[in-house]
Amino acid sequence: KYGYRATRELTGHGVGKELHEEPMISNVVVGPASKTPVIKLGQTLAIEIIYVEGNPKLILEEDGWTISVKDGTLSAVHEETVMVTQDGCSILTVPSLFQIV
């Protein structure tokens, strides 16, 4: 509706003994539902959505850490950490004030 796109290059993921674990959770539909990860009771998941104003291609900057939008347009990320429960999910992320970086 507003022209923003979700990037395919970064994903949400499971969180456990390691920060980044399976399942990888895509920001966009990439195949049939039968091929999407199965979410299980007790799993903790980081749901990360990166929106971009222009082309969603990303680049890794020379510092080896910073990721930018290749065409230089604006981008934003929203992330929530949730735990799958018997009743659905519990949001574990602590609310904070928005910070423009």
PLM segments and residue spans:
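Conserved, well-structured core segments that form or line functional sites
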Residues: 1-27, 34-37, 43-56
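Charged, cofactor-coupling segments
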Residues: 30-101
